[in-house]
Amino acid sequence: VGSEMCIRDSLHSGSIFANEQGIKVIDPEFAFYGPMGYDIGNVIGNLFFAWANKAYTGGSAETQTALEQTIRETCDKTAEKLAAEYDKLVTFPLYCASAFRKAYLDGVMADSYGYAGTEIIRRVVGDSKVIEVTSVTDPAQRLPMERALIDLGIYLIKNRAGGLNGAAVTEEFRKILA
């Protein structure tokens, strides 16, 4: 894990505003220089809260499918865009070598999935909970939802370096939900 960019810390869906003109991120006072996988992981991790909430509170199958697709596409398009930007911006010959490029980009995505797992667990068991969890007041719904999220967090942490992608992480969460 290296210091690769200025990251937001605590980045989540509530701090991102997007429209046709661009994207804005609020609360920059939390920013620091660190691994880009941290912010990417926070975004990925936070997307699972909406899906878990709908899965345990009777959300429609259509909504759950849309959330699953959003997560899968976010993971995969992030990896694709990172690779495209790398190819566009990196010019130093050693860093352009295919083995180095692959190791670096795989490392960023491994960090991202690992941080997604820690973000999920932190938001379930820590002091900074999310509304998708706290709004579920029925213990018969909330406890299994929290367990599913923790299980996913553990999976992401343990398997972060195993070449995960959007299909793998959404398939795993479907298995956990079953």
Task: Tell me the role of every PLM-derived stretch.
Residues 10-16:
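Catalytic-loop signature of eukaryotic-like protein kinases
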Residues 16, 33-35, 52:
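Conserved protein kinase catalytic core
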Residues 27-31:
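Activation of the activation-loop gatekeeper triad in protein kinase-fold domains
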Residues 94-96:
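Long, amphipathic alpha-helical stalk/connector segments used for oligomerization, subunit docking
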